[in-house]
Each structure stands twice: as C-alpha cells, then as structure tokens.
A protein has these predicted regions:
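Short secondary-structure boundary/capping segments
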Residues: 7, 23-24, 44
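Short, conserved beta-strand element in jelly-roll/cupin
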Residues: 2-17
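Ligand-binding loop in jelly-roll beta-barrel domains
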Residues: 27, 36-60
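Functional cleft and adjacent loop/helix regions within the main domain
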Residues: 2, 30-32, 41
C-alpha cells in the first residue's frame, strides 16, 4: 500500500487485480481506478501474458 491513486488500462490479455478483500478480472479494453492506500496487487491472470498502461499519482 502507498498513498495516492492508480489508473490501470488493459492493453492486451487478462489481468487479475486483488484490491482489499475483492478480486477483479479485467480484459482487453477494461480499466479500473482506485485509491492506493488499500492493499492491492496487479498481475496477469492464469499465468498468461498481459500488457497494461498504468498511471500512478502520489501526493508528494
């Protein structure tokens, strides 16, 4: 976790995002925006390859 906010856009593949106690599956063209202070982990789903565009804002 860290202060700030994040935006993730899936360019290709499938991405799994663990956010707090929730899990989200994003496919190509999907996006998500969240508060980074909540525990989170972003990874390609099912051991496949994925490409994302990530934008991270930190208040520093």
């Amino acid at each position: 976790t860290h202060e700030g906010e994040e935006f993730i856009y899936v360019l290709s593949g499938v991405v799994e995002i663990n956010y707090g106690k929730n899990t989200y599956i994003l496919e190509e063209g999907d996006s998500i925006y969240y508060d980074s202070i909540v525990a989170h982990h972003v990874h390609a789903a099912a051991d496949n390859r994925a490409r994302i565009l990530g934008v991270v804002y930190t208040p520093y």
